[in-house]
Structures are given as C-alpha cells and as structure tokens.
Swiss-Prot record:
Cited function: Catalyzes the NADPH-dependent reduction of L-glutamate 5-phosphate into L-glutamate 5-semialdehyde and phosphate. The product spontaneously undergoes cyclization to form 1-pyrroline-5-carboxylate.
GO biological processes: L-proline biosynthetic process
Descriptive protein name: Gamma-glutamyl phosphate reductase
Gene: proA
Source organism: Xylella fastidiosa (strain M12)
Pathway: Amino-acid biosynthesis; L-proline biosynthesis; L-glutamate 5-semialdehyde from L-glutamate: step 2/2
Length: 435
C-alpha cells in the first residue's frame, strides 16, 4: 500500500474536485454508491462473515459482535441510508448571512467544505459507508481508518464505493481506506496537519484518548455514552418505565443507550420494584447503591466504577438521590456529556435540568434513543460529538462544512483617502496611508 502521506495528498487533490461538484452531480454519485452496495451484497456479507469468525475465535464480547455484524437487512439499510443522504439539502453554498454595510460593501457568509476529514473508528462497518457518503455530500475528501476486527468488511464496502466514483469519472482517491492496521501508520496519519483538516475518532475510550493525545490536527471526539435517566419525584411511573425499557433494551450496544438510572428518593419505593419487574424479561442485570439494594434485595451492590461505565450491554447502574441537585451533581461527576434524560411533571425542574447540564443532548420526558441524527431531523449523522466546538451533539452535513466570508465591493477602501489620479500624478506621489 502506498505511503500514508502520499495517500493523504491524493485525497486532498481529489477533494478540490469534489468541492466544485454540483448538487445534482453529488446526488447521482451517492445513488450510484447505494446501488454498488446492493450489487456487491454477497461479497460484502461474505467478508463480514469472515470478520465475525475471526472475532469469535478471539472471544470478542457480544456488544462488539453486534456492532460488527451485517446481515441482508442491515446492508440494505446501509444502501437506503446513502439514498437518503443523496436526497438531503446540499449545505455547500448555503448563505447563512447576507448584509450590506453603510459603505456599500456586500457581505455574505457561505458554507464551504472543510477539505479532508479523517475518520478513525472501531467495528461498525456501516460507518464506512455512512461517513464516506456524508463527507462526499458535503464536498469533502474522506480518509477512513477502521478497526482490524472489520478490515475485510471495510475493504469490500470501500471497493464498492470507489467503483461508483470511477463510474462518475471522479478520482477514487476521494475516498481512502487505510488498510495498514499498524499503530505507527495511524500515528503518522495524525501528524498530517498540512493535508488533513479534521479528525473524528469514534470508538472506545482508549482509541479516543490515543487520538486526542497524538493528533496535530483538530479533533472532534465522539466519546463514550454514559447516558442517564433521572426519575423525578413527580414523574409518571408508567412513562418512566416505558422510557427506561426503550433506552436500555432496544439497542444496548448503541452509544445513546441508558447506562445509569437515578431515582428521587420520594418515588423510589413505588418506582423501582415496578421498573425491576419490567426489565426482568429482557435479562437486564441491575447494580445499585445500598438504598437500592434495600428495596431490591436481588440487585448487586454497585461500585464507583459502575457509575462511570459505558456497559454497551444489558447492565444498568442505579442510584437513589435525595433531590434534583444530587442528580445533577452525579451526572456532572460521572457523565460523558453525551445524552441525559429527566422524567418529570414539574416544568421548573425540567428547566433546571436543561439549564444546569451541558451535555450534547438533553431530553425532557423522551427516550435517550432519540439522540440520533435521523431522529433529530438531521437526516443522517457521522457521529455524536461530545467536544464543545462548532459541532456538538449529532453531527449532520452542516457540521462537515465551515462558513467563510465573501465580500463584494466597488473599489471601497478602509483607510486610503480618496485620490483622483491624473495623467501627471504618479503612484509614487500618492500620500501615505495612515492607520
């Protein structure tokens, strides 16, 4: 495989071409990419089966296997997602400010592509297709570095997408898949600040910390999801249980799944036994503080580490708290700035919860599972940013662009005095510009 710097340079050159594509050209390209995934379905699924076999021999956990696995339905959903992205409004060229100043200059703020984005991720072969499509729709080149556990799947998916680029008479180097899994190659990639404009790590805590510590490129972290649901004293118990089951059991390996349940002490004796009974058919293991264990004798005693854990599994930590302030303090201490939920009938408590927490997504009487680009109306997401920069929370197409100023005038100057040049006046005799 060519040297990583050479690949990044090729991607940057290709990105300049992508940045000039019309909305219609990008739409046709993404539709062709979707068709390529459908056409190569057998090859992609065979590659994924080989990845799964290797993962099982390495005794990978069930959460990782779930993120890694593809089947015909998931692959068809990947292709449909590309078609959905193709149909989304094009952010490139959008005017976000239009102003004419008193001196007559016309000022616009216009969205343009970022340039080249590096995506470093684990498992989840669907990210290969989603990230590529989103970056290309926003006019960016994309360098993908997936995990070794999904290398065969990623190669098969990237091969299909690159074929679509060729069919559109575009350089396939607009999409680079790094196939060298060596750590030193990733380190070198993270140093290429002259060729890569943004790096997005999406995976486990260790991966994200490694990227953040070694990158010379701006990083938007998609950190772990230690998501909380706080059941306030005034909560509707049936609603709280419904949100809990949806948040914990429907996709426990998702980053927006609930990991910790906080319960107001006044409602705990009525709520917790009912919640435990509702969770029992799903096989959820409960770990609680001493107060919880008193109410639910079968619950394991939680450790401090349990409250900081992103289980990505059917495990739930529980703590009974005396009031809203205690719930907020717990979330500040153990949370990851991802997604928090309050279940309450008290509007003042809801407002306090929203105002006092600075997580990327805060829900009032709604499931944590809505913390998703599609569910929030973005159409698609490249991930959920927990870094407080221009993109915070689910990152859609707009977050893959930047705004720049375009200024049009008729010769206006800021400091230079008005001068009438005649044929006998030379530029050398012009008065000096004063500050």
């Amino acid at each position: 495989m060519p040297h990583i710097r050479h690949l990044a340079q090729q991607c940057r050159d290709a990105a300049r071409i992508l940045a000039t594509l019309s909305t219609d050209a990008k739409r046709r390209l993404l539709e062709t990419m979707a068709t390529a995934l459908n056409t190569d379905a057998a090859t992609i699924l065979a590659a994924n089966a080989a990845d799964l076999d290797t993962a099982r021999t390495q005794q990978v956990g069930t959460a990782m296997l779930d993120r890694l696995a593809l089947d015909p339905q998931r692959l068809a959903a990947m292709a449909d997602a590309l078609r959905d992205i193709a149909a989304l409004p094009d952010p490139v060229g959008q005017v976000t400010r239009d102003d004419r100043r008193p001196n007559g200059i016309h000022i616009q703020k216009i969205r343009v592509p970022l340039g080249v984005i590096a995506m470093i991720y684990e498992a989840r072969p669907n990210v290969t297709a989603d990230a590529a499509a989103l970056c290309i729709k926003a006019g960016n080149g994309i360098i993908l570095r997936g995990g070794s556990e999904a290398i065969r799947s990623n190669i098969a998916i990237a091969t299909a997408l690159q074929r679509a680029l060729r069919l559109a008479s575009l350089p396939e180097t607009a999409l680079i898949l790094v196939q060298d899994m060596a750590r030193h190659t990733m380190l070198e990639l993270l140093q290429l600040s002259d060729l890569i404009d943004l790096v997005i790590p999406r995976g486990g805590e260790g991966l994200i910390r490694f990227v953040a510590e070694h990158a010379r490129i701006p990083v938007i972290k998609h950190y772990k999801g230690v998501c909380h649901q706080f059941v306030d004293a005034s909560a509707d118990i049936e609603m709280a249980i419904r949100l809990l089951i949806d948040g914990k059991t429907t996709r426990p390996a998702a980053c927006n799944a609930l990991e910790t349940l906080l319960v107001h002490t006044d409602i705990a004796p009525r709520f917790l036994p009912a919640a435990a009974a509702a969770l029992r058919p799903y096989g959820v293991q409960l770990r609680g503080d001493h107060a919880t264990c008193t109410l639910l004798p079968d619950v394991l005693l939680a450790t401090d580490a349990d409250y900081a854990a992103e289980y990505l599994d059917l495990i739930l930590a529980i703590r009974i708290v005396p009031n809203l302030d205690a719930a907020l303090e717990h979330i500040r201490r153990y949370g990851s700035d991802h997604t928090e939920v309050i279940v309450t009938a008290d509007p003042a408590h809801a407002d306090t919860f929203v105002q006092q927490l600075h997580s990327a997504v805060v829900m009032v009487n709604a499931s944590s599972r809505f913390s998703d680009g599609g569910a929030l109306g973005l159409g698609a997401e490249i991930g959920i940013s927990t870094t407080r920069l221009h993109a915070y929370g689910p990152m859609g197409l707009d977050a893959l662009t930047v705004e720049r100023f375009v200024v049009r005038g008729q010769g206006q100057v800021r400091h230079c005095p008005l001068i009438h040049l005649h044929r006998d006046v030379s530029v050398a005799n012009m008065p000096p510009i004063t500050s």
